[in-house]
Amino acid sequence: MDLLATLQCADQPGIVHAMTTAILNCGGNIIENQQFTDPTTKTFVMRTRFETSQGEKAANDSLDKELSRFSPSLSIRPTNQKPCALILVTKESHCLRDLLYLFELGELHIDIPLVVSNHIELKELVESHGIPFLHLPVSVENKSEQEKAILAKIAELKIDFVVLARYMQVLSQHFCTQMPGKIINIHHSFLPGFKGAKPYHQAHDRGVKIIGATAHFVTDELDEGPIIEQDVAHVSHSSTAEDLLAIGRDIERRVLAKAVKLYSEDRIFLVGKRTIIFS
């Protein structure tokens, strides 16, 4: 059996030795290992892929026995187990299309049991991929009720994380606190950058020379969550606002897809307001 273990705890001597001992004791063999100690917070993180003939329970028991004294946040799962993603969208399709395309190719190791939107425009696209589509229109009056409906679906479908693929609604503090570190958003700027409506028009008006996009975890502070992935492209004085929009869309879809892939492979560790990422 091929297993993946992730660990996070305060840095202290003996953690790596305990991990390797635990894997050896359950008949395991390490295939891949990455580790890092954050010098500021003294937090140790580790991602270890290993194989064992004794099964998941034996591995769990062995790791618990050897590592419990370090009081770690420890997770073990089969590498072929796919995390379950709920996608939220509005009207823009470029990020959603890319996620669905990569999902169909098998390049994203996730399951997508449902796509939810506050508009109806993307229903046909979603259902053409054999994925259920749920239309939940949002207004000032019903926003709280609709968020409760989404949270109910998250519980019902055992969703592991949420992807905001250009979902143009600000999630409430209550919603964000229900899934800390489990909601990924794509922001149309290389943060910090232009906020609000028409960011590419703002960028054009300021004569910027690079534009970009940022994928980050959602918190109750708008667009201030820990950054997962970023990318940029160079532009010039001859680039129109429409040029910037087209270039920006391409960056957005790539950055969001990379963030989803990193999350699905348990490569992201949250340490305060920062992320540690094993590529």
Walk through the language-model features, giving the residues of each.
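Short glycine-/aliphatic-rich beta-strand segments at the starts of folded cytosolic domains
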Residues: M1-A10
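One-carbon transfer enzymes
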Residues: F36-S279
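N-terminal short leaders/motifs
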Residues: M1-D2, C26-Q35, T40
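Short amphipathic alpha-helix segments
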Residues: Q12-E32
